[in-house]
């Protein structure tokens, strides 16, 4: 759409901005949302989250722990093995070509956040949305039960993983 008009403005996340630029070399990035966020906030800009029903998390703490462990490893692999991740992105249809992902991945800012760090980041993000329009977050900010901040079994599993990595 933006490419159809010379005066158009678009806000696109990675990898879509890179895909658009590879199709139209005249497109340019005039600001980086992460950099702009960092100028006004001391938290990480949140653009994606994993959601789980509370009941399921309580009934399946080992499944949640295993998922989060795999997720953390996946984030690490995505940042360290750009070629492999790019090929996987093409294979599963995230992007049309691995070349797009290969160029975009270093700009994607893929991170793993959990516990209080995650809660701080998401709370700040939701506060910005709420301040702009309370309806954007359902009219009120969520309470502490909204955040999954690792029950004791998960803390033990995560500590064991961190210790084994040393």
Outline where the language-model segments fall:
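Secondary-structure end/capping motifs
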Residues: 57-136
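Short secondary-structure capping/turn micro-motifs that flank functional sites
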Residues: 18-19, 95, 105, 145-146
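Short alpha-helix boundary/capping motifs
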Residues: 29-30, 113-118, 157-158
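Pocket-lining segment of extracytoplasmic ligand-binding domains
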Residues: 3-89
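A generic structural signal for short, solvent-exposed coil/turn residues
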Residues: 21, 42, 102, 138-140
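Residue-level "edge-of-site" marker
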Residues: 15, 102, 118, 142-143
């Amino acid at each position: 759409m933006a490419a159809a008009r010379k005066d158009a403005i678009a806000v696109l996340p990675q990898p879509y901005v890179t895909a658009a630029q590879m199709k139209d070399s005249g497109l340019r990035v005039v600001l980086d949302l992460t950099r702009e966020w960092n100028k006004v906030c001391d938290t990480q800009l949140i653009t994606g989250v994993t959601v789980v029903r509370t009941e399921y998390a309580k009934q399946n703490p080992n499944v949640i722990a295993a998922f989060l462990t795999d997720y953390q490893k996946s984030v690490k692999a995505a940042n360290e093995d750009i070629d492999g991740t790019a090929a996987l992105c093409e294979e599963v249809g995230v992007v049309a070509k691995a070349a797009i992902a290969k160029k975009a991945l270093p700009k994607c800012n893929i991170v793993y956040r959990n516990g209080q760090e995650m809660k701080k980041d998401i709370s700040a993000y939701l506060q910005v949305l709420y301040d702009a329009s309370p309806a954007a977050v359902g009219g009120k900010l969520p309470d502490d039960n909204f955040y999954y901040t690792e029950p004791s079994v998960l803390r033990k599993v995560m500590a064991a993983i961190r210790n084994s990595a040393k």
